[in-house]
Amino acid sequence: MRALLAQNRLVTLCGTGGVGKTRLAIQIASASELRDGLCFVDLAPITESGIVAATAARAVGLPDQPGRSTMDSLRRFIGNRRMLMVLDNCEHLLDACAALVVELLGACPELTILATSREPIGMAGEITWRVPSMSITDEAVELFADRASRVQPGFTIANHNAAAVGEICRRLDGIPLAIEFAAARVRSMSPLEIADGLDDCFRLLAGGVRGAVQRQQTLRASIDWSHALLTETEQILFRRLAPFVGGFDLAAVRAVAAGSDLDPFSVLDQLTLLVDKSLVVADDCQGRTRYRLLETVRRYALEKLGDSGEADVHARHRDYYTALAASLNTPADNDHQRLVARAETEIDNLRAAFAWSRENGHITEALQLASSLQPIWFGRAHLREGLSWFNSILEDQRFHRLAVSTAVRARALADKAMLSTWLATSPVGATDIIAPAQQALAMAREVGDPAALVRALTACGCSSGYNAEAAAPYFAEATDLARAIDDKWTLCQILYWRGVGTCISGDPNALRAAAEECRDLADTIGDRFVSRHCSLWLSLAQMWAGNLTEALELSREITAEAEASNDVPTKVLGLYTQAQVLAYCGASAAHAIAGACIAAATELGGVYQGIGYAAMTYAALAAGDVTAALEASDAARPILRAQPDQVTMHQVLMAQLALAGGDAIAARQFANDAVDATNGWHRMVALTIRARVATARGEPELARDDAHAALACGAELHIYQGMPDAMELLAGLAGEVGSHSEGVRLLGAAAALRQQTRQVRFKIWDAGYQASVTALREAMGDEDFDRAWAEGAALSTDEAIAYAQRGRGERKRPARGWGSLTPTERDVVRLVSEGLSNKDIAKRLFVSPRTVQTHLTHVYAKLGLASRVQLVDEAARRGSPS
C-alpha cells in the first residue's frame, strides 16, 4: 500500500462494511512520511453533500472563512504542502467526494488522497485496492483471541477450543467486525457454543435476495446473529438508537428511546447490556460517558426501526435536540458557554435532526432548529454552515408551498440576514442583505410575535451598513423589546452590534460605556465570544484616550484567550489592535505582530484578511517604509470594499501614504473623503492629515484651520492619541508667522504628551518636524528656545490645548480671495466641484439648501465670481481649495 501511495495520488480502499478499511487507512496514514503530515476526514456522520468540503476544512484546522468559498480556502491552505488526506466513509457522498478530490488534486500538486468506501469513487486516475478479509488461519484467530481476552481476562486459545475458534473465523469470512462481535460473547458462551449459534444465523439468511452482494450478506449475517441474541427489550432499545449520529449520552437515550414498552429507569441496564454485547460502544469523554453505534451497526438498526413502524422515534430525536438548541437562546446566568459547548458536542445529532425534518417536510421545525443555533453559528464560527441551512429551505422552491408559521419564517429571514452581514456575502448595506431583514420585520409586526420582532429589528440594525444613525431606531426598539421579554442572548447581540457602531463613532467615552454594558451582560450569561470582543473595544478606547500601555496589555490578554479558545476572528482583531498600538509606540514588534495578524486572517479570508493587511500598513508607516506600506494598503483596499466603514477608515492611511509618496492632490482627496465620512478619533486623525497636506501645498491658513479643528475634536472627546501631531503642526505654522515662542511652547507641550502617553511620531513625518525645530531654534537661540520648550512641557494637557486655541480667533482672514473663505465655505466649494446640487450638499453638511445658497453667495462675492460654472472652473484651476 505504501508503494501504491508513493506512485499514485488517489488510492481508494474498497470493501464490505466491517472489513477493516478505516483501520487499515489509519495504519497506512500513521506510517506516512510526507513532510507536512496528514489529516483525517470522517464523513460517516455527514448527511449533507454540501458540507463535505467544510468537513475537510475543519479536519485540517480551518474555521469558517467569511468572504471566501470553503473550497478556495482548502486549496489555498493545502497549496504545495506534501501531505496525506484520508477521506473515510465516502460511499454515501460519492459525487461530493469526487468534486472535492478533483478540485484538490488539480490545485494541490503535492497532495495525496487515501479514501475508504464501499464502492470506488469512480474517477479517472483512481487506483482501487480491495481490502481482503483477514487470513482465517492466523490474523482472524489472533484478533478473536485479543478481543476475547478483553472481555474475559485470561482467555487463551488452546487445544480444547482452537478448532471452534477456527470455525468461527472461517464462517464469518475473516471479517473483523463480525469476529469482534463473536469474541464479545466469550463473556457468556464458549467458543464451541458460539460456533453452534452461527448455524441458525446462516440458515436464517439462506433465503435472502440472490442478487445481494456477498459482503452485505456476510455482514448482515453477523449483525443479524447478534441481534437475534438480544432480548425483546434489548431489541427495542437497539433499534431506537438508530437516529443518533456521532454519539449520545444517557439522558438523550432516555428521552428518545423510553416509552410504555421501555421503562426509563431500565434504560441504563439495557444500554449496559448492549455495550457488553458489542452493539454499542462506550467512550470516556472528559470524565463523562458517551455512547455510539458503529456506522454499519447503525444502518442495520435504521432498517429495524423502519420495519417496526416506530417513525415517531425520529420525531422524538428531533424534538429532544431542538429543545437543547432552544436552551441556547434562554441561558441562565453564566450558563451560555456550557450550553454552547454541549451543543457543539451534539452537532452531528443536530445536523441529523435538521436533515430528517427537512427531508420529511417538517419545515417549521427545521427552521426553528436553525434559528435556535445562532449562538453556535456565531460563537463557534460555523457561520457558513448556518447560512447553508437557511438557504437550503428559504431558497428551495419545493418548500415554498408548505405551510410555515409567519413568525418562524420571519425569524429565519432575520437570522439569515445577520449571518449574511457577518460573512459579508455582499457589501454591507446591499439590497440582498437588507431585503430579507426588512421582509422579516414586516412579517413580525404583522403577527405581533415579540421574539420574532426583536430578531427582525436586530437584523435590520445589523444590515444597515454600520450606519449608526440608520441603525439607531432599530436597535433602540429591539433593546426595549428584548428587555421586556427577558431575551438575554438577543439583548447581548443587540448591545454588541450597537458597540460596533460606536467603534466607528471614534468616541472613546461612548465606546467604553457601550463595551462595559455589553461585556457585563455577556459575562452574566457566560458568552465569552462577545465578552472578548467587548474587551477589545475597551483596549481601543484606551488607545484613543492615549493610554497605550493599558491598551496593549488588554489586547494581548484577549488575543491569548482567543487563541486558546480557537476563536480566530477575535484573535485577528486582537492582533490588529496590538499592531496598531505598537506602531503608535514606535515598537519594531509591530511588524511581526502584523505578520501574525495576516497569517491568522488568511484562515478566515474576507474582510479579516483586509484587516490583516491594514495592520501591516500601520506597522510599515510607523517604521517609515512607504513601499511596504503601499503594498499592504493595496492588498487591503479591494478586500475591505464589502465593509464601507473599513474602507472609510482606511482612507486615512491612504492619505498619509499619498502624501509621503509626494502626491498631495491624491492625499487631499483621500483626506477630504475621510473627514466627510468619519467622526471622533478617525476624524481627528483625518483633519490632521489634511492639515499636513495643506502645509505641503503652501496653504497655511487651511492647515491652521484643520489642525485647530483636529485639536478641538480631541479636546471635546478627551482623545489624546494623535493630538501631539496636531500640536506640532500648529507649532511649525506659528513659527512661519513669527510667533516663535508660541511655536516652541507647543513643541514642548507635544513632547511632554508623547512622553506621558508613549506616543511616537511616525518616521515619515520626522523630516518635517526636525525642520520646524531647527528653524525655531535658529530664530530664538538656544537659551530662549530651551526656556520656551520647558514652559510648554510644564503645561498640563488641558492647559496646552487651551494655549494652542487661545490665539485662533485673533488671526484675521483677508476680505477677498481664496484665503478669505471659511472652512464651511471651502467645503461647499469642494462639493460643488464634485457636481453636487444644493440639496445634496445640504445633506452632506447637515444644513438646509437655503444655508448652502447663502454660503455660495458669500463665496461668489469674496472671489469676484458670478456663477456656479465659473466657480467650478476656478476651483479646478487651483486644484480645489479644500
Swiss-Prot record:
All residue ranges annotated as the HTH luxR-type domain in the record: 814-879
Keywords carried by this UniProt record: DNA-binding, Transcription, Transcription regulation
Annotated Gene3D superfamilies: P-loop containing nucleotide triphosphate hydrolases, Tetratricopeptide repeat domain, Winged helix-like DNA-binding domain superfamily/Winged helix DNA-binding domain
Short name of one Pfam family: GerE
Keyword Membrane on entry: no
Any GO MF annotation of the entry: DNA binding
Family matches, as SMART domains: HTH_LUXR (SM00421)
An individual GO BP term: regulation of DNA-templated transcription
Keyword Glycoprotein recorded: no
UniProt DNA-binding residue ranges: 838-857
Name of the featured protein: Putative HTH-type transcriptional regulator Mb0914c
Source organism of this protein record: Mycobacterium bovis (strain ATCC BAA-935 / AF2122/97)
Lineage of origin: Bacteria, Bacillati, Actinomycetota, Actinomycetes, Mycobacteriales
